[in-house]
């Protein structure tokens, strides 16, 4: 008993000493006694090092008047109508009939084309529509017999830099539990009528005659063959590559239909954006890859720079969404149509809902037991499980990103940092974007700490193609971006030695 009392008194004395120590700390080291292991105990004034008084804070870019108008016109009701119409075709399996007027993927394709064409007819020639495709032979996997793969493509041609292209897509094919069942019902409301609905809605709104034309070209696509092996997207990406098209960004919207997880958790104001790290070897060879890793550039690939741009321009009160950038190609065991674009050498990223509910993806329509709870639940990718307001907000995120991309200058080329001599400053050089300097109002150097995910600082260096900054290249990550004549920011590019 005496030992217990002695131990308690010793412990009390220790806590009293700790409290006195905390009270004596300078303000910058202060911690809360309700949380004595507060993180500031392990921090110090040097935590923000390197401390520099250069440039300014890199704040989010506010949407322009034209963009605010676009965002205000994206309609949840139209999106719902599109999804229900696509579901009405019974199945949109890539192998399903292409000759039936009301059932199967052929009927769905013709309806999508007619909708794009309807918007084109109202656009005063701004929007053009075509169906492109090829005959895919049996692949010994999910294509057991030859089939026509068709993509529906609507193009809003830019005015100023029309050779620079941005692509947004959703896949209109669907499947149920059996990836080879091309006769059974496969509604595909979320996967991926939701993504197609966004492509259609953005084409409708952005092609209106009372809006200015974008500077760059925007392509709105509905592709097939995704569930069977990303065939339609691969065909589209390779078509762009074979024609040397300058695609500076691609987004796929795949499974963006629900804000509710399988446990009922709701995240109605969050969208995930998956962005790949190290590019495929066919895009950057081994020597280039080793060089990127050597300079710590594995987190500054074109796809991740594109994702940073989305975060900076599309996360605001007008979209009412948080863009959760995931530094990963895709979810585990899943794939998407951004991958063929990445493999073709284009920056690309995938939007997808915050939490998956696998009872409503790739499932036969049925009532069955929930393996977790044992209760009967409805299986199947049905419209009743879609959140149309959520989809419209995802559409707004896409619209904000695409419009800002298409109205800003393209990416600077041949961006370099001088490493010929040891120094504590950083000297950069670059060439204008592929479209030249016609849309450029100046250039900015941006930077962040090596552990920060997004740009934190910027410095406007004017209409130049080289600049030196009094901040060591060893201590931060730099990027160079073009700025439009009205302040529109472009995508930053990592400088290589």
From Swiss-Prot:
Keywords: Glycoprotein, Hydrolase, Metal-binding, Metalloprotease, Protease, Secreted, Signal, Zinc. GO terms for molecular function: metal ion binding; metalloexopeptidase activity. It comes from the Eukaryota. PROSITE patterns: FN3 (PS50853). The keyword NAD does not apply. Its cofactor is Zn(2+). Residues 411-497 form the Fibronectin type-III domain. InterPro entries: FN3_dom, FN3_sf, Ig-like_fold, M28_fam, Peptidase_M28. GO terms for biological process: proteolysis. It is found in: Secreted. This is Probable zinc metalloprotease ARB_04732. It comes from Arthroderma benhamiae (strain ATCC MYA-4681 / CBS 112371) (Trichophyton mentagrophytes).
């Amino acid at each position: 008993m005496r030992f217990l009392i002695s131990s308690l008194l010793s412990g009390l004395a220790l806590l009293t000493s700790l409290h006195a120590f905390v009270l004596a700390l300078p303000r910058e080291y202060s911690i809360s006694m309700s949380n004595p292991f507060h993180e500031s105990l392990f921090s110090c004034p040097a935590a923000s090092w390197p401390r520099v008084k250069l440039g300014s804070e890199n704040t989010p870019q506010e949407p322009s008047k034209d963009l605010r108008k676009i965002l205000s016109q994206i309609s949840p009701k139209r999106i719902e109508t599109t999804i229900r119409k696509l579901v009405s075709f019974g199945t949109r399996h890539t192998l399903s009939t292409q000759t039936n007027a009301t059932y199967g993927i052929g009927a769905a394709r013709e309806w999508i084309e007619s909708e794009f064409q309807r918007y084109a007819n109202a656009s005063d020639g701004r929007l053009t529509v075509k169906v492109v495709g090829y005959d895919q032979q049996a692949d010994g996997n999910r294509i057991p017999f030859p089939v026509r793969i068709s993509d529906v493509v609507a193009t809003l041609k830019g005015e100023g830099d029309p050779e620079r292209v941005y692509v947004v897509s959703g896949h209109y094919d669907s499947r149920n539990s059996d990836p080879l069942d091309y006769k059974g019902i496969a509604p595909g409301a979320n996967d991926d009528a939701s993504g197609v609905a966004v492509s259609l809605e953005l084409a409708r709104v952005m092609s209106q005659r009372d809006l200015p034309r974008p500077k760059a070209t925007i392509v709105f696509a509905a592709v097939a063959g995704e569930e069977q092996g990303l065939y339609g997207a691969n065909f589209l990406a390779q078509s762009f590559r074979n024609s040397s098209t300058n695609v500076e960004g691609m987004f796929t919207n795949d499974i963006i239909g629900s804000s509710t997880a399988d446990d009922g958790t709701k995240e109605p104001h969050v969208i995930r954006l998956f962005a790949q790290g190290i590019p495929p070897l066919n895009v950057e060879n081994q020597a280039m890859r080793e060089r990127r890793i050597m300079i710590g550039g594995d987190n500054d690939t074109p796809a991740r720079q594109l994702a940073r741009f989305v975060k900076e321009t599309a996360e605001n009160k007008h979209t009412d969404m948080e863009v959760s950038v995931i530094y990963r190609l895709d979810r585990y065991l899943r794939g998407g149509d951004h991958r063929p674009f990445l493999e073709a050498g284009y920056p690309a990223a995938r939007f997808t809902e915050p939490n998956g509910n696998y009872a409503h993806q790739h499932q036969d329509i049925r009532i069955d037991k929930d393996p977790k709870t044992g209760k009967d639940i409805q299986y199947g990718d049905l419209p009743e499980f879609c959140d149309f307001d959520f989809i419209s907000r995802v559409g707004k995120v896409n619209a904000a990103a695409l419009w800002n991309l298409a109205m800003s200058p393209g990416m600077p080329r041949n961006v370099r940092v001088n490493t010929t001599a040891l120094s504590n400053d950083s000297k950069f050089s670059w060439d204008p974007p592929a479209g030249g300097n016609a849309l450029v109002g100046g250039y900015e150097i941006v930077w962040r700490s090596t552990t920060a995910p997004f740009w934190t600082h910027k410095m406007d260096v004017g209409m130049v193609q080289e600049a030196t900054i009094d901040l060591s290249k060893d201590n931060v990550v730099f990027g160079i971006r073009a700025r439009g004549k009205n302040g529109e920011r472009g995508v930053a590019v990592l400088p290589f030695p």
